[in-house]
Amino acid sequence: MTSTPSKSRKSAKAAKAAKAEAAAFAKSRALSKTPPPFRNRVVDKKVLKELVAWAFKNHGTAATASMADQLKDLGFKYATQAAVSISVNDLKVPAAKKDLLDQAEELITETEESYRLGVITEVERHTKVIDTWTETNERLVDAVKKNFNDNDPLNSVWMMANSGARGNMSQVRQLVGMRGLMANPQGEIIDLPIRTNFREGLTVTEYVISSYGARKGLVDTALRTADSGYLTRRLVDVAQDVIVREDDCGTMRSIMVKAEDGRFGNRLVGRLTADQVLGADGEVIAERNSEIDPPLSKRFEAAGVSALMVRSPLTCEANRSVCRKCYGWALAHNQLVDLGEAVGIIAAQSIGEPGTQLTMRTFHTGGVSTAESGVVRSKFEGTVEFGSKAKVRPYRTPHGVNAQQSDVDFSLTIKPSGSGKPQKIEITNGSLLFVDDGQKIASDVTVATIAAGAVQKSVEKATKDVICDLAGQVSYDPTIQPREVTDRQGNITHKAQRLGRMWVLAGDVYNLPPNARPVVSSGGSVIESQVLAEASQASEYGGAIRLREALGDSREVQIVTTSMTLRDFKLLGESTHAGEIWNLEAKDGTRYRLNTIPGSKIGNAEVIAELADDRFRTQTGGLVKFAPGLAIKKARSAKNGYEVNKGGTLLWIPQETHEINKDISLLMITDGQWIEAGTEVVKDIFSQTAGIVSVTQKNDILREIIVRSGSFHLCTEKKALERFQGDGVMVNPGEAIAKGISSDAMVFVQAVETPEGTGLLLRPVEEYTIPNEAQLPDLGHVKQPNGPHLGIKATQRLAFKDNELVKSVEGVELLRTQLMLETFDTTPQMTVDVEAVPDKRAKTIERLQLVILESILVRRDTISDSSHGSTHTELQVEDGQSIKAGDVVATTQILCKQAGVAEMPEATEDEPVRRLIVERPEDTITINTSGAPVVTVGQRVVDGEELAQGQPSDCCGEVEQVSANSVTMRLGRPYMISPDSLLHVRDGDLVQRGDGLALLVFERQKTGDIVQGLPRIEELLEARRPRESSILCKKPGTVEIKQGEDDEFTTVTVIESDDAIAEYPILLGRNVMVSDGQQVNAGELLTDGPINPHELLECFFEDLRSRKPLMDAAQEAIAKLQHRLVTEVQNVYKSQGVSIHDKHIEVIVRQMTSKVRIEDAGDTTLLPGELIELRQVENTNQAMSITGGAPAEFTPVLLGITKASLNTDSFISAASFQETTRVLTEAAIEGKSDWLRGLKENVIIGRLIPAGTGFSGFEEELRAEAGPHPDILSEDPAGYRRMQNLRPDYTVDMPAAPAAKSTALLDDPSAADLEATRSRHGIEAEASNFAAFTRPDADNELAEEQVLDPAAVENLQEQGLLSDE
């Protein structure tokens, strides 16, 4: 019952609150007298953001919401009045566009020209073109901006893009500038940009080029939403149980945050300092555990603090949660986070939500970025001086410009030609110089590009083909110096050693057919239509010619080399429903079934026909036995049966076998029963013979039913039964079998069990006589002195071998007599044609003819393809003509198309002449010179080089003749070849237009596999092992680099601190990222490539392990990796312009790195290979050190978010995520308990979640009052009342009736009240505080179980408060 003092206390409180409210109101009135700050400037998106943030910080939520509302109204009002909309006329194309494009065109024409003259390579041309267009595009954007700013600053499009309301510059550029370069489906950039914009409209070609990218964008967006949603789900699952559960974990560990360019930006805001922070002069700026707000962050910057230690979720030591001090501010209200805040879920959502904004990937940029290096120009005319410190080496830029690269830092001076101060330029290592020492230069000349620090970019090797543009003869410049390179497989390739030109000198190149031989001599003159080369096709064996109809562009000539007609046999064909059947009939009437049909081809040892013979056909299946003397040839496969070696007698014991696959319930007879023919043994299956049945079954499924015919005799004679046990024995006629049992014929005796008793079954034996050789008429064969032979032989084949059991109901054929083809030539392509021919005497009778044909395909004259010259083919034979072996069947001539001089390369043994060249009059040019020529014979000249004083050449080629006032040149085309390129052609080779000349090998910046956006985030958070990861240094030391022979591989040796030597072999195609003599640390990259995070953690741990205790080494290694992961994830988001606070990523990374793997359990109860929390192992090992046991050894592990989710302590959470069955079965087998600590488990079970208002931080006070469980409320009409627990975790809520007397809600009931309630329920006083189930206490000790009073339970059940259970 409440008493009066508590009433008075309440009224005093109310008065106090009213006073405070009045004071606050007065203060706000006073504040409003100071004039609001007045700002006069353009407000764009950025300023709006700052304005709303300022309002939120200083005036709270309600005021900000109201202000935002007013801003919106203001915006709409003026947008309406100003009529901001987009019309076609707002899209204004800058006038400067035409000039910019013309300049670009001019540059590109120059580039193409230098490529044509062989000054730059194909790769350099491509790079230059792409860079030119990229630069033009950038200059055009500037022109667009300038145009809008100067001429129409209030243009709707410009205002939208500029203020950040909608759209960005790249979109405006496409509307009014140019669309620019597009990528093709392979991701390479097409070097033809789209010059028009959307205002001018695209041509069909441009539209098609851009449609690829547009479709890709749409598909990416669709995929992205799904991917991003799944990422969020995994993140939520891994972090859902991270809840702020304590105020301060008291850890002394922390992370360091460094200033970037002297500024911290937002990176410190909302964190707590881990140590005192001192300024440069030693004054204390902040104590430990100070909250850092923006003003304090600015003070740090002002005081010159470059790095400081802050508390972070990564180092928090709170058990299975994060404490308030380590987490810092909740970013929703910029105050220290509350207890019970579900920070894990907030972190997951913060990282997952921007996923949709991340691109899936962008494409290759192809061009080489020129942004990192600053271009320096000369300010006046003067002379260049390098100075004594300079060290330079020749270098060719990616655009093909010959420059010099500096190897050291030095100063370059330009001394003016007149008076004045010299210009000094600081040159850094790696910079490019475009001038020479002592060179005189004009003003505004590019002197150098300064490299921005020693940046080692990762590059990859790429290749590009050089394709020949004209037919002719290849000639190298001597500078190329080709060398032979043999690779590991023994293939020989030719490589260029130096930069140089490869020339192709013009001419008409003819390809010769494989067997053609030239009929003109090298250097001889040829006239039009003269035969240059001739090829002939000859017969190999000779024979009768058959000309076939022409097919397409070729004609088949068949030569019958051998033929054989079976004269003793008639060929008879009959039609059946299954198709045509052909038989051979001999004079004595025996018939053979033909296995092939006329018109088909057969090979050696194939069966032509088979004797139709029923003498060896049985009635049923049975057992085969060979009598002594019968022999067969061993065969590899029994498919065609076994050939008889020697004739003899074959014994056959018939038995009928039914192979069945049916249920045993369908069986209609019993095992061992005697049945008559026609008995139904299984439903719908009848026996053909009488005999004894045996049944084979397996798992109540019938397999076989065997019926053995014969005569059955009951027998009790033990000796006889033993003799005939098992497989049975063959007994000759008249031989005694048992007492009173004998047989006149040969029988096969077996002992059998029947329902009547044991007895002997005498089975009949059939005898078949097998002749030694097949009795056949003469078949004959044809032999030729030099052609292939042909013959037919008869063979007998037995279908089964000795003791083989034939399972069958129908009869089988035991012996087959077959006619086989025998060609004594065993070449696989030798086939025989089977033909039906009429008999020479009786035309109605058909005979079988076997023919061996030689087939020659003769090309008909087609409208000749130009490379073959004009070909002319003639047949030299007629149909039916007989020719001898080696006679020519057809000849092909290659005719000259235009008069000229024929040349051909030298024929070698391994390579005959396959091409020849005719140098035509138009391939040379004679130029008259005004003065004496300055060139010599054999010299190669390109456009613009002087032939005579003041007379430049207007074509490229090789000088062939020089006279007093003229020069004759053979036209040609130079191709620049870069060093290390693969040469496909040799000096002097002849090439056709479109042939590959060389493969240029060049290095380009790696762009293809920068996995951007989502896939990269996923790769990091799932801790994926990359396919080709970089090689990491295991221990710190000094690097030594050794080159392997032939540049095949490099070895990087690291001499470690204890003088141990670690060797890292590096394969071809990998770029070494360290230099000789460099100091490296553990985990540093030795080669380029993606890093394997697992390997990195291992490197850190192994290195620290040798110097520090196990626990410290693990913590430090994990800390290094955590820092790396957070930075990497942040980099991806920053590159896409998304800002996420570090602490969210830290919460996730903390979950990924919280586990260690036990290697050796020591004396602990842990198991080797178990994944367990680091803190748990730490506690276990501390306990071991007290008791003196051996501690557990472990290694830290990194788990991807999916793995971490499946490895949580809660099996309910893991099962609801993935692999439900596996997780639940394992949990059941291991007998796991789930302590329901996280949110997900509780949601699934349907309890209050332990976050926010359900957070159990106030548990202790409740426990003190009411024991360990939430309370059950009585249904007392006076209101809600506490009652001691009946069952844990169940709350019975009953609505209260309007209060009759003013009892304070949830105050403790008085003794009298309790007594009344008890008496109403009939509960005895002692029984009221029983606990039906007790929950394990906080320290996991079970409270003792108390016994229920049966009477009380019964009473409660009657009232329906306890169920029967």
Swiss-Prot record:
Binding residue positions for Zn(2+): 249, 316, 323, 326
GO biological process: DNA-templated transcription
Keyword Cell membrane: no
Domain of life, source organism: Bacteria
Family assignment from sequence similarity: Belongs to the RNA polymerase beta' chain family. RpoC2 subfamily.
An annotated Gene Ontology molecular function: DNA binding
Taxonomic lineage: Bacteria, Bacillati, Cyanobacteriota, Cyanophyceae, Synechococcales
Enzyme class, first EC level, given as a word: transferase
Protein name (Swiss-Prot/TrEMBL): DNA-directed RNA polymerase subunit beta'
Coiled coil: none
Catalysed reactions listed for this entry: RNA(n) + a ribonucleoside 5'-triphosphate = RNA(n+1) + diphosphate
Assembly information from the UniProt record: In cyanobacteria the RNAP catalytic core is composed of 2 alpha, 1 beta, 1 beta', 1 gamma and 1 omega subunit. When a sigma factor is associated with the core the holoenzyme is formed, which can initiate transcription.
Function as written in the Swiss-Prot or TrEMBL entry: DNA-dependent RNA polymerase catalyzes the transcription of DNA into RNA using the four ribonucleoside triphosphates as substrates.
Cofactor binding, per record: Binds 1 Zn(2+) ion per subunit.
Species: Synechococcus sp. (strain CC9311)
EC number: 2.7.7.6
Cofactor(s) recorded in Swiss-Prot or TrEMBL: Zn(2+)
GO (cellular component) term, any one: DNA-directed RNA polymerase complex
InterPro entries, per the entry: DNA-dir_RpoC2_beta_pp, DNA-dir_RpoC_beta_prime, RNA_pol_Rpb1_3, RNA_pol_Rpb1_3_sf, RNA_pol_Rpb1_4, RNA_pol_Rpb1_5, Rpb1_funnel_sf
Keywords: DNA-directed RNA polymerase, Metal-binding, Nucleotidyltransferase, Transcription, Transferase, Zinc
